[in-house]
A protein has these predicted regions:
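Lectin-like carbohydrate-binding module/patch detector with strong preference for beta-trefoil
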Residues: 7-182
Length: 182
């Protein structure tokens, strides 16, 4: 048996009750949490949606595009080991939104998972405007997801220091479908 798989076991027995360490350990084991979503991430200022632009390669830029609800506009809030922090994972390409930039206007990129210590791949979704919208803040840099002023489709998704403007405010909406007519 490999060293990482060794088990130590002990039992306490009293009449009608027997407790082993395997039983107790399962009480404290962390359960796998499922991602939340999928969501469309919509800019309050422009109505544009965060979009992969059909890219599937590590390091490509995220875009803002007219909302249509196709898989490349759907994002999951993946669990992390940090309270209040999530990974923003593309439902289309499984890449994470990466906020490694440190300058106002730097592009947001989609990257492979770098591990639990990659703070630039963790995000805080902070309620604003009475909970009707959110600011999406990078845990590593403190920069926020930003829609450039007067953006039209397609536009780059950028990072910016928080200033409270509507271009830094986002709605996470359930995907929608257009009803068939006929």
């Amino acid at each position: 048996m490999p060293p990482g798989e060794r088990r130590v076991s002990a039992e306490i027995g009293v009449p009608f009750l027997k407790i082993g360490t395997d039983d107790v350990g399962s009480l404290f084991r962390r359960r796998a949490r499922k991602p939340l979503g999928p969501f469309l991430v919509l800019s309050v200022s422009s109505g544009l949606a965060l979009d992969t632009a059909l890219h599937t390669r590590h390091g490509t830029r995220a875009h803002l595009w007219r909302a249509h609800g196709q898989p490349h506009q759907l994002w999951l809030l993946g669990p992390t080991d940090r309270d209040g922090e999530f990974e923003l994972v593309s439902a289309a390409n499984n890449l994470l939104l990466d906020g490694r930039g440190a300058q106002d206007g730097d592009s947001v990129r989609m990257c492979d998972r770098h591990g639990a210590d990659a703070a630039w791949q963790r995000w805080r979704v902070v309620a604003v405007d009475g909970g009707r919208a959110h600011r999406i803040e990078n845990a590593g840099t403190g920069m926020v997801l930003d829609c450039p002023y007067e953006a039209v489709s397609p536009a780059p998704a950028t990072l910016w220091a928080p200033h409270g403007g509507s271009n830094q405010t986002w709605v996470l909406a359930a995907p929608f479908t257009v009803a068939a007519t006929g």
